[in-house]
């Protein structure tokens, strides 16, 4: 224990002193000379880390501190773009856990008879499954849908502030190509010809990838993200790069504040702000968002969309902005649960580049045998709901009517708030160059809770404490597995207790979907959590709940 504390003070003090000198440009190749370190410098520095070594012990570490600082300068002389990951890879799989290995045919619900509306704009809120059937039967063309959605993006996008870049030329080319292929009998599947948008942290060749931030608003990354490539291979049509909260926080970006289509006075929440807003407003067939800590769940709740946050290690982040290498996840934001299944089926799987990915089958089947299904619910969180409690209680009523035998459960009791430093430290590393160059001063939000201050504050997190937090995270993963081995899926208030933070740390998948409306007329949501790599069963259960309600069929009145 003494040795660990000794190492902690070394790294803690060096972490502090490393930010005292003037800002060093990342491009500098020659390390700067190191300022001598004295006890007078080290003594107050240790207090910030909660340490209390006497002067004799501090004196004995001074030489080591200088050597460490020299090492830091050598590292800082190397340019590390955002897309370079750390060599340490996060593993969400608990000891003894086994996921399904056998791949089975993907099954979707029969489309039934889908009638084309007389006015093509009335198709704007159709599900992906419905649009796919119209395209497959050549009742409507991809080009017709694409033009309709492009017109809506131009008409409603400015007021919602949900679009960064229209990829109009690309979209029209892709739509025409889709129509040609389908006319020749080369139908690629249910996403063929479907127009969509992506959160503007996914790179698209030939277009800006702004990350929602002033310092990057003219950035062009000359590659297509893996998710973009896979959707293109599925025949989908990319129409727009959609807004995101600056560097994946909130709904404020360099061009404004993305709006909730149900209430324009509200922001859409974030950080997948434009993806949720545009999908809810019927400006795209579906969209792609990301989540590190609530960025699919929160805007989907605010805007009334259905979102899937997949298991960590399911969807490639290649070509996506990194915020937290051990917590970032990419998933669809749609109008229905089954739409999420269709999109997820196209984007999941290893790509040979993102080394955190696992090859696990996605055996989706919408049928559910409630007699064999073990469904848990967070009893304490449901009992503690204050606002909109009747809505939350109605979720349990619906599930019981469907045949679910609900099992009350409790989440593991560990100091989760302390683990937030994992995200803070990784985010600070991902944007180290931005901070040390001083360009973080260009960012829109500069209050204490915004990224610039968070990045600076996180330089005071000792490396030892970051590692210790991840050791506690390991315990959390094992404890969560003890809970999940007895249930298949559990339901939770989307913002009830520690569930959102906990499951983002453990990597468990989540489906968030509307479950009602407030008295002000804005959507509310409920979340379903599944086994690691258990998206198939999770989506099937969530679909059963959604089919028993009609909240997803209601749409906002838009302002021009």
What does each model-found stretch correspond to?
Residues 1-10:
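Bacterial N-terminal signal peptides that target proteins for export
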Residues 55, 61-293, 311, 397:
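Gly/Ser-rich catalytic/binding loops embedded in alpha/beta enzyme cores
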Residues 109-122, 191-211, 369-378, 421-477, ...:
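Short helix-loop capping/hinge segments that flank enzyme active sites or metal/cofactor-binding pockets
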Residues 109-114, 309-393, 547-560:
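A short helix-breaking turn/cap at a secondary-structure junction
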Residues 138, 193, 233, 237-239, ...:
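Glycine-rich, small-residue loops and helix-cap segments
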Residues 139, 144-150, 176, 384-412, ...:
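Acyltransferase
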Residues 223-347, 493, 504, 508-527:
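Short glycine/serine-rich loop segments
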């Amino acid at each position: 224990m003494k040795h660990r504390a000794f190492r902690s003070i070394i790294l803690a003090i060096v972490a502090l002193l490393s930010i005292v000198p003037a800002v060093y440009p990342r491009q500098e190749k020659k390390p700067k000379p190191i300022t001598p370190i004295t006890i007078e410098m080290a003594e107050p520095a240790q207090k910030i880390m909660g340490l209390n070594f006497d002067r004799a012990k501090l004196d004995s570490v001074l030489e080591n501190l200088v050597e460490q600082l020299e090492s830091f300068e050598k590292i800082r002389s190397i340019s590390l773009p955002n897309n370079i990951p750390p060599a340490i890879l996060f593993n969400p799989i608990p000891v003894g856990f086994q996921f399904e290995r056998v791949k089975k045919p993907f099954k979707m619900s029969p489309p039934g008879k889908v009638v084309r509306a007389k006015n093509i704009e009335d198709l704007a809120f159709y599900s992906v499954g419905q649009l796919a059937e119209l395209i497959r039967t050549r009742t409507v063309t991809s080009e017709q849908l694409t033009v309709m959605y492009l017109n809506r993006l131009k008409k409603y996008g400015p007021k919602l502030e949900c679009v960064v870049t229209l990829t109009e030329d690309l979209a029209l080319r892709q739509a025409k190509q889709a129509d040609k292929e389908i006319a020749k009998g080369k139908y690629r599947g249910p996403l063929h010809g479907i127009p969509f948008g992506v959160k503007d942290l996914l790179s698209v060749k030939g277009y800006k990838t702004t990350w929602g931030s002033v310092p990057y608003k003219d950035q062009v990354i000359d590659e297509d993200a893996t998710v973009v490539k896979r959707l293109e291979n599925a025949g989908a049509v990319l129409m727009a790069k959609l807004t995101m909260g600056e560097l994946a926080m909130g709904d404020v970006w360099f061009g404004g504040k993305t709006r909730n289509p149900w209430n324009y006075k509200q922001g859409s929440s974030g950080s997948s702000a434009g993806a949720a807003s545009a999908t809810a407003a019927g400006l795209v067939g579906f969209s792609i968002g990301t989540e590190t800590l609530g960025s699919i769940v929160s805007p989907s709740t605010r805007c009334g969309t259905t979102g899937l946050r997949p298991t960590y290690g399911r969807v490639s982040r290649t070509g996506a902005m990194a915020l937290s290498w051990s917590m970032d996840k990419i998933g669809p934001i749609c109008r229905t649960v089954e739409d999420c299944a269709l999109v997820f089926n196209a984007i999941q799987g290893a790509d040979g580049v993102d080394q955190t990915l696992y090859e696990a089958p996605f055996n989706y089947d919408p049928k559910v045998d409630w007699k064999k299904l073990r469904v848990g619910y967070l009893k304490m969180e449901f009992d503690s709901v204050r606002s909109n409690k009747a809505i939350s209680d109605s979720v349990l009523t619906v599930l019981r009517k469907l045949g679910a035998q609900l099992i009350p459960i409790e989440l593991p009791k560990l100091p989760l708030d302390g683990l937030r430093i994992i995200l803070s430290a990784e985010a600070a590393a991902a944007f180290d160059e931005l901070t040390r160059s001083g360009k973080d001063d260009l960012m829109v939000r500069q209050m204490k809770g915004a990224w610039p201050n968070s990045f600076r504050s996180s330089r005071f997190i000792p490396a030892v404490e970051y590692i210790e937090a991840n050791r506690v995270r390991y315990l959390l993963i094992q404890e969560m597995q003890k809970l999940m081995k007895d249930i298949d899926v559990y339901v939770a208030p989307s913002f009830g207790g520690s569930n959102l933070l906990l499951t983002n740390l453990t990597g468990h998948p989540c489906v968030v979907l509307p479950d009602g409306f407030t008295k002000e007329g804005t959507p509310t949501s409920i979340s379903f959590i599944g086994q690691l790599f258990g998206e198939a069963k999770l989506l099937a259960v969530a679909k059963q709940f959604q089919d028993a309600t009609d909240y997803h069929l209601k749409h906002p009145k838009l302002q021009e």
